[in-house]
């Protein structure tokens, strides 16, 4: 009986050791942020939404699409509420493929408010190949698509850390405690002062992660 108990203790100890790496790779619950839009009576902060679009345009748009939104959505009530002229200028800053013309040829033209946001890649395959085999998710409805919503996205953006001792990562993989397995293929793209906000707000990592 004593030998059996000793064996049981040894097996239990070995089991605890084997489980330790798994426990260290568990996702951490997202940080809870006091969002202005929280609750039934919450409203979006117009200035924050405009800053968030600036972060998207200057940082995120090189990889992430917003294919379910049109440029005119930027001027709608409850959103960033850019003026009509601002929306036209934003849309016109993009070259949109259109056609065919009378000769059957495709052509490019300046964007219009009615156009969908231009995607950075022509298709899913191209986007996946350009990002190490990981498809950058579309950001149109990302908050609704992710468990934890805005808290989760914010946490991931501020959650990059050096891996703890004993944890090794493949090339092109980064440690982030808010991701499943604590691994993410998207590099840490935010750093203090990266964007010069049009309204003069200091662009800390925390601020940009909240705005976008």
Features from the language model and the residues they span:
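Post-cleavage N-terminal segment of exported redox proteins
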Residues: 2-43
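Electrostatic cytochrome c docking/interface patches
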Residues: 29-54, 65-79, 83-84, 200, ...
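Short, contiguous pre-domain boundary segments
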Residues: 30-40, 115-122, 129, 192-197
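Solvent-exposed, polar/charged alpha-helical surfaces in well-ordered, non-transmembrane soluble domains
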Residues: 50, 54, 58-61, 137, ...
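C-type cytochrome heme c attachment motif
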Residues: 54-65, 118-124, 135-144
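Structured domain cores in non-transmembrane regions
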Residues: 75-130
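Acidic, glycine-rich loop-and-strand cores that form catalytic or ligand-binding grooves
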Residues: 134-171
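Extended, hydrophilic extramembrane loops/domains of integral membrane proteins
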Residues: 178-180, 184-212
């Amino acid at each position: 009986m004593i030998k059996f108990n000793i064996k049981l203790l040894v097996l239990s100890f070995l089991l605890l050791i084997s489980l330790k790496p798994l426990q260290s790779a568990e996702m951490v619950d997202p940080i809870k942020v006091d969002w202005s839009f929280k609750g039934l009576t919450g409203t979006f902060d117009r200035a924050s939404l405009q800053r968030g679009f600036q972060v998207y345009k200057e940082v995120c748009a090189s990889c992430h699409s917003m294919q379910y939104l049109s440029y005119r959505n930027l001027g709608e009530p409850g959103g960033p509420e850019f003026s009509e002229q601002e929306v036209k200028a934003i849309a016109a800053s993009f070259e949109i493929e259109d056609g065919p013309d009378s000769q059957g040829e495709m052509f490019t033209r300046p964007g219009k408010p009615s156009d969908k946001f231009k995607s950075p890649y022509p298709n899913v395959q191209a986007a996946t190949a350009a990002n190490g085999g990981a498809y950058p998710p579309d950001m149109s409805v990302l908050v609704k698509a992710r468990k934890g919503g805005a808290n989760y996205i914010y946490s991931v953006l501020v959650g990059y850390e050096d891996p703890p001792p004993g944890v090794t990562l493949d090339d092109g993989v980064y440690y982030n405690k808010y991701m499943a397995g604590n691994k993410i293929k998207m590099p840490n793209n935010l750093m203090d002062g990266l964007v010069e906000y049009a309204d003069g707000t200091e662009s800390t990592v925390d601020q940009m992660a909240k705005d976008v």
